[in-house]
């Protein structure tokens, strides 16, 4: 089974892990409802950039 020949230095380990961190989500205020939403995503009511792009779905459980 392969084993490392040398100990990995802290700086090399840190460079490898540099992309593992979590970044905060980009959040904006929705123009139509005033609620928070992720930027560059369609809101729950179907609006994107002030325009309706999706038609709203009916209430859950209605037949």
UniProtKB/Swiss-Prot annotation:
Keywords for this protein:
Ribonucleoprotein, Ribosomal protein
Highest taxon above the source species: Bacteria
| GO MF, one annotated term | structural constituent of ribosome
Segment Disordered: which positions? 1-26
Kindly give the Pfam families that the UniProt entry links to this protein: Ribosomal_L32p
Q: Name one GO cellular component term.
A: large ribosomal subunit
Q: Record's SUPFAM superfamilies?
A: Zn-binding ribosomal proteins
Checking PANTHER family in the record gives: 50S RIBOSOMAL PROTEIN L32, LARGE RIBOSOMAL SUBUNIT PROTEIN BL32
Q: Which family does it belong to?
A: Belongs to the bacterial ribosomal protein bL32 family.
Q: List the protein's name.
A: Large ribosomal subunit protein bL32
**Top-level taxonomy:** Bacteria, Pseudomonadati, Pseudomonadota, Alphaproteobacteria, Rickettsiales
């Amino acid at each position: 089974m392969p084993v490392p020949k040398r100990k990995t230095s802290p700086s090399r380990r840190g460079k490898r892990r540099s992309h593992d961190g979590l970044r905060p989500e980009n959040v904006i205020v929705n123009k139509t409802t005033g609620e928070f939403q992720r930027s560059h995503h369609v809101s729950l009511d179907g609006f994107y950039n002030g325009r309706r792009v999706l038609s709203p779905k009916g209430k859950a459980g209605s037949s």
